[in-house]
Amino acid sequence: MPIVDSGSVSPLSDAEKNKIRAAWDIVYKNYEKNGVDILVKFFTGTPAAQAFFPKFKGLTTADALKKSSDVRWHAERIINAVNDAVKSMDDTEKMSMKLQELSVKHAQSFYVDRQYFKVLAGIIADTTAPGDAGFEKLMSMICILLSSAY
């Protein structure tokens, strides 16, 4: 299933949740490195997205991005937000509240273009569980909630 950022998706089945947890546990064990790798891949593949991050100005190479403490800090925030969503799969109300709060911040304080949530979600999905429909469904849920304040 392709990742979507509007509408709705069907609830995750228990089997999908178990598969997501197993795949995510592997990625999250090394969350600092994997988070940075994901964010670097995002910025090198989508350089226009850096415009929303003034602290990242001038970081034009993968090596420069990886060495930046600001990039590492933001990568950790992203990976931990996904981890919170994975941990909240059985409590979608909790997941919704956290992600809707992030949506408001990104829409009203940071003015991030919501199209980038879907791009980043695709990179996270490809890194964690390439081609897995359940993980893509979770990423869709996250994108839909992150787009809710737009």
UniProtKB/Swiss-Prot annotation:
Molecular function (Gene Ontology), one example: oxygen carrier activity
Domain Globin: 11-150
Swiss-Prot/TrEMBL keywords: Heme, Iron, Metal-binding, Oxygen transport, Transport
Alphabetical list of InterPro entries matching this protein: Globin, Globin-like_sf, Globin/Proto, Globin_lamprey/hagfish
SUPFAM superfamilies: Globin-like
Binding site for heme b: 74, 106
Family, as annotated: Belongs to the globin family.
Subunit and partners: Monomer.
Protein name (Swiss-Prot/TrEMBL): Globin-2
Native organism: Mordacia mordax
